[in-house]
Amino acid sequence: MNEQNSYYAFISYNSADEKWAKWLQHNLEYYHIPSALCKEYPELPKKIRPVFWYKQDLSGTKLKKALNNELSSSKYLIVICSPDSAKADWVNDEVVAFIEQGKGDRIIPFIVAGTPHAKNPDEECFPPALRNLTRDEEIRGIDVRRKEGKSHALVDVIATMFGVRFDVLWQRHERRRKKIRNIWIAIASVFLL
């Protein structure tokens, strides 16, 4: 990350989705990047830190200006997408600001509820700025509700930020998870003997 980007990512969300913002921020910052991947891609960071998320609803001109500064010093914008965030003016404003900064290709929609481009407005999860992109600008959303689960969605976000294929990162993630599980099984079996 260069000096221009104080934050690896900025999480934009509505207060109704705060638990998702908190979960995502924590899991990104504490994700252990597989060492084999770092060897294969030496340009990758060792950690995904810091990740910015604001814990309260936005109000006040000074606060908006401060958040725009944080947004402009972020490498990626992760938008927690739900019907609540689709209706939140400040979520849309943050997406618009990021696009205006020339970083529209670094927006990652993280879908937690609703449907992108829904026929029923009550089910729409994308804020207007994401719905109104041209066909060439359209962004693929990462849906946490898929049967693969939250861990799968987290790895998908990281793979997207790193510009590596999902399956490459997922295989290494699963290998590490199995290795840790086997270590815990070995430790538990020692205590059971």
Report residues per predicted region.
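C-terminal interaction surface of TIR/SEFIR-family domains
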Residues: 1-29, 49-50, 55-73, 83-89, ...
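Short mixed-charge
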Residues: 30-51
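Redox-cofactor binding/interface segments in oxidoreductases and associated redox assembly factors
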Residues: 79
